[in-house]
A protein has these predicted regions:
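Compositionally biased, intrinsically disordered low-complexity segments enriched
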Residues: 22-25, 37, 110, 132, ...
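Extracellular glycan-recognition regions
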Residues: 27-218
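Sequence signature of WD/YWTD-type beta-propeller architectures
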Residues: 214-511
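Bacterial Sec-dependent N-terminal signal peptides
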Residues: 1-28
Length: 511
């Protein structure tokens, strides 16, 4: 068969375009499955993943994302169902285009006029939830009062989308839209648009997370989501996932030599080697059914654990065991539930929350201490409701704890003999588990939203913040935005140098 020269050229061009498109679509970048330019862009974009730093750089051109046509660069993965997208992002350099933009986007397809929802941050600070409900229709938007946030979250719940933003350190502000009806799989990812067909812009992204939340049929403590063990620099907020497993991993403690993390899972304890990134079973003899309240002594020689009593009748009692492992020694009396949270700096005392017969309320737990070698327990608090999370300061002058006595769960402290109980926080959130840095300068806690969680509860699988404040007093600052809760940071998790913390975040890993 004979072809004309012009026909051969046309076929070659078509073939080349198909190859470029295929390569663009199939290029895996970090957690994303592919990337492509959407629309008729003049300058090809790109997305690069730095695995060492767990960061993304996305370059994009394109005239706009507006009216009935979009032009931008998109790094994406296909998903279905509900999800939570979260990132911290910023543009590289300055630009003459006030409306260059980046953010999260969910699209029905990769064509230029697809139905879509975008959590959009513009170069001049304009922040908006933009959406096109049907293909070939104009984009609509819901603007925020916040200008230029760097933390961006987009959540899908059925046909509802919720955009939440914050300047790092602050709590989220949200907007939402409903009646967004996508069919089947959608394209989910990060985008950059130059807002100028002749220009190219670049944005950097860190702490990129795609979370699949718990379904409505999940029964707490019967079924669990997967877990990420993460570490974070508390000053910069930079996070890194060290280990992931489709199981409930909880409450990592940093060992005093800085070499391992100790966590619990499925009733046992594990040591996670920070060099090899491999866990190994920590031997606890006949003691099983260990929960997430375990604490390493200040000198690093002993471990306190909370586990079912030897007779199996009490769900949690306190034991001690050498950090080399062995047969634990029962410390607390068999009078009711006891959950360990702290050692005294000299190693002579353990402090814990316990339920005894003198408080008939369901959540009636008070703070106690007991000699670490065993002996008579001493009650330190005695109020209705829940006192929890007692932890000694490194100088031994205070025991920090959280209490619901003022209405919401707030942070408190007292002298080691129970005197001079004073409230440290008083905000519109539920703040749990005050963890004091080894240098005594900082307090980190986990914060639950009062609209999602009762003050005396700290359940799995919720939107939570990790927040930090000076130990000398001051406002709480958000240092992490995550999906977690129970098991995230129940017990001390500071690195020995007071620069980092370890914690657990959650997502469904069943598929």
């Amino acid at each position: 068969m004979r072809f004309k020269t012009s026909s051969i050229i046309k076929l070659s061009i078509i073939s080349s375009c198909m190859m470029l498109s295929a390569n663009s679509f199939s290029q895996k970048t970090g957690i994303f499955e592919g990337q492509t330019d959407v629309g008729k862009v003049l300058h090809s974009g790109d997305a690069i993943y730095n695995s060492a730093n767990d960061e993304y750089s996305v370059t994009g051109s394109g005239a706009n994302i507006w009216f009935t046509n979009d032009e931008f660069h998109f790094v994406w993965k296909k998903m279905k169902g509900d999800f939570i997208l979260r990132v911290r992002g910023k543009f590289q350099g300055k630009s003459v285009e006030a409306h260059r933009k980046f953010g999260w986007m969910v699209r029905q397809g990769l064509d230029t006029s697809s139905a879509m929802v975008a959590a959009t941050i513009h170069g001049d600070g304009l922040t908006s939830l933009q959406y096109r409900k049907a293909a070939h229709t104009n984009v609509e938007e819901n603007k925020f009062d916040v200008s230029g946030p760097d933390v961006v979250q987009l959540e899908r719940k059925g046909n509802q989308f919720i955009m939440s933003v914050a300047h790092f350190g602050e709590t989220f502000v949200s907007r939402q839209i409903s009646d967004i009806n996508f069919d089947g799989d959608v394209y989910v990812g990060l985008f950059v648009c130059a807002h100028n067909k002749n220009a190219v812009e670049k944005a950097d992204f860190e702490n990129v997370r795609i979370v699949i939340p718990a379904g409505k049929d999940l029964v707490p403590y019967k079924k669990y989501l997967g877990s990420h063990i993460e570490t974070m620099d508390v000053i910069t907020g930079k996070r890194k996932i060290l280990y992931s497993e489709n199981a409930s991993l909880q409450a990592p403690n940093w060992t005093k030599d800085g070499k391992n993390l100790l966590y619990n899972s499925n009733g046992s304890l594990f040591l996670f080697d920070l060099k090899t990134h491999k866990p190994k079973l920590f031997p606890t003899g006949r003691v099983k059914d260990i929960n997430n309240d375990h604490v390493i002594s200040f000198d690093g020689k002993m471990l306190g654990i909370s586990a079912r009593s030897p007779d199996g009748k009490i769900g949690s009692t306190v034991f001690t065991v050498p950090m080399t492992g062995g047969e634990p020694k029962l410390i607390t009396p068999l009078l009711g539930f006891s959950y360990l949270h702290g050692w005294s700096p000299d190693g002579k005392w353990l402090t814990y929350t316990a339920k005894r017969n003198n408080d008939p309320t369901p959540a009636g737990f008070d703070i106690y201490k007991i000699p670490s070698k065993g002996g008579k327990e001493i009650q330190l608090t005695n109020v209705k409701g829940l006192d929890d999370g007692p932890e000694y300061s490194p100088d031994g002058k205070y025991i920090y704890f959280n209490s619901v006595r003022s209405g919401l769960m707030q942070l408190w402290r007292m002298k080691p003999d129970g005197s001079d109980q004073e409230q440290l926080t008083n905000d519109d959130y539920n703040n749990w588990f005050a963890h004091i840095s080894p240098d005594g300068k900082w307090i980190v806690c986990i914060t639950f939203l009062k609209d999602e969680v009762k003050p005396d509860d700290h359940p799995f699988y919720k939107h939570v913040y990790l927040r930090m404040m000076p130990a000398s007093g001051g406002p709480l600052k958000v240092i992490a935005y995550l999906y977690g809760g129970q098991g995230t940071i129940n017990t001390p998790s500071w690195s020995p140098d007071s620069k980092k913390i370890a914690f657990v975040s959650n997502t469904d890993m069943s598929e």
